[in-house]
């Protein structure tokens, strides 16, 4: 499965913010249900941290839901 790029303007994005940005969850509180019901992988390793910092180059995968790669958006000069 090809990872969908997620562009950020900050040094990192937290896992719950990433899933809200991608409309996987509507509120930050829903991350608990995702972590309880699905295996969430960050760079191939299982993640159970709601607010795990995800950096450019990191790949987040949720089986049956999708896969996303964080990309640093270049600042316009």
Predicted feature residues:
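A detector for short, charged/polar N-terminal pre-domain segments
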Residues: 1-13
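A basic, amphipathic helix-loop patch mediating RNA/tRNA/ribosome contacts
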Residues: 14-56
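A generic "binding-loop/recognition-motif" signal
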Residues: 11, 38, 66
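Low-complexity, intrinsically disordered short peptide segments enriched in small/polar/basic residues
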Residues: 3-5, 37, 59-62
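Intrinsically disordered, low-complexity regions
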Residues: 4, 29, 45, 65-67
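Small beta-barrel nucleic-acid-binding modules, principally OB-folds
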Residues: 4, 17-18, 74
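C-terminal structural segments of small proteins and small subunits
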Residues: 49-77
